[in-house]
UniProtKB/Swiss-Prot annotation:
Gene from which this protein is expressed: rplI
Name of the protein described by the UniProt record: Large ribosomal subunit protein bL9
Matches recorded under InterPro entries: Ribosomal_bL9, Ribosomal_bL9/RNase_H1_N, Ribosomal_bL9_bac/chp, Ribosomal_bL9_C, Ribosomal_bL9_C_sf, Ribosomal_bL9_N, Ribosomal_bL9_N_sf
Gene Ontology terms: biological process: translation
Protein family according to the UniProt entry: Belongs to the bacterial ribosomal protein bL9 family.
Keywords, ordered alphabetically: Ribonucleoprotein, Ribosomal protein, RNA-binding, rRNA-binding
């Protein structure tokens, strides 16, 4: 399946690249999420007419993501959670909790932008959590999980 990318896609290509992908990847991810269009003559012509507009929108989105990352890196997100003996949490702190703490601190952060490859936090302490805000805009956020023994 041959597609034209409408934005930068990790491990695939940049805006405007014509790429060959497996049909399932194209049909189930790239096309429905608006990241690509089929590489027909009509779509190629349409894309070339709008290329400057799309590149400008992509640049603005990347700059906005970079600004949000700088704000997040300046913050220390503090999350209070109930703990038992030995500092273990009742439940866990996951991406949704971290995104909510960022929202309360005044910085927009979606749950899907938080990367926790080791899984949710289950012990009170200080953690560096990865965030991926745009294709090449990634960093870490300091998260402190405080125990609330009540």
């Amino acid at each position: 399946m041959e597609l034209i990318l409408l934005e930068k896609v990790s491990n695939l290509g940049n805006l405007g690249d014509r790429v060959r992908v497996r049909p399932g990847y194209g049909r189930n991810y790239l096309l429905p999420y608006g990241k690509a269009k089929m590489a027909t003559e009509e779509n190629i012509r349409y894309f070339e007419e709008r290329r400057a507009e799309l590149e400008k929108a992509a640049r603005e989105a990347e700059q906005a993501a970079q600004a949000r990352l700088e704000q997040l890196q300046e913050l220390t997100l503090t999350i209070k959670a109930k703990v038992g003996e030995q500092g273990k949490l009742f439940g866990s702190v996951g991406p949704a909790d971290i995104a909510e703490a960022a929202e309360q601190a005044g910085v927009e952060l979606a749950r899907r932008e938080v990367r926790m490859p080791e899984g949710p936090i289950r012990v009170a302490g200080e953690y560096d959590v990865q965030v991926s805000l745009y294709t090449d805009v990634e960093g870490t956020v300091k998260v402190v999980v405080e125990g609330d023994a009540s």
